[in-house]
């Protein structure tokens, strides 16, 4: 029984497959857990000892469909249902014609 170089050629089964949550090939088939995001755990796996890994998958690295809108609304103070004041240039142009 060898446990080194000669036994590596006998490996032929897949231990990891694609994860449903993060998409990486880190989902362990026998353990049924993802090594990257921790699926099926409810909380996403993240550690401070790898600041670079956090940077790769934090807010702002994707589309941010919702957060883009929130940032814009925040700048305007989350106002809703108001009508903008008419601009002077627009008022002058409409009155002259």
From Swiss-Prot:
It holds the Pfam family Ribosomal_L37e. Component of the large ribosomal subunit. A zinc finger (C4-type) spans 19-37. PANTHER family: 60S RIBOSOMAL PROTEIN L37, RIBOSOMAL PROTEIN L37. Keywords: Cytoplasm, Metal-binding, Ribonucleoprotein, Ribosomal protein, RNA-binding, rRNA-binding, Zinc, Zinc-finger. One of its GO terms (molecular function) is zinc ion binding. One of its GO terms (biological process) is translation. Zn(2+) binds at residues 19, 22, 34, 37. Belongs to the eukaryotic ribosomal protein eL37 family. Residues 45-65 are annotated as: Disordered. HAMAP family: Ribosomal_eL37 (MF_00547). One of its GO terms (cellular component) is cytosolic large ribosomal subunit. This is Large ribosomal subunit protein eL37. Gene3D superfamilies: 2.20.25.30. It is found in: Cytoplasm. Component of the large ribosomal subunit. The ribosome is a large ribonucleoprotein complex responsible for the synthesis of proteins in the cell.
């Amino acid at each position: 029984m060898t446990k080194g170089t000669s036994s590596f050629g006998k490996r032929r089964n897949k231990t990891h497959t694609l994860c449903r949550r993060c998409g990486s090939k880190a989902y362990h088939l026998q353990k049924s857990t993802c090594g990257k995001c921790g699926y099926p755990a409810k909380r996403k796996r993240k550690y401070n000892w790898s600041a670079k890994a956090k940077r790769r998958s934090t807010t702002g690295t994707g589309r941010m469909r919702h957060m883009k809108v929130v940032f814009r609304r925040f700048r305007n103070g989350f106002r809703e249902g108001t009508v903008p004041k008419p601009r002077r240039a627009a008022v002058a142009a409409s009155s002259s014609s």
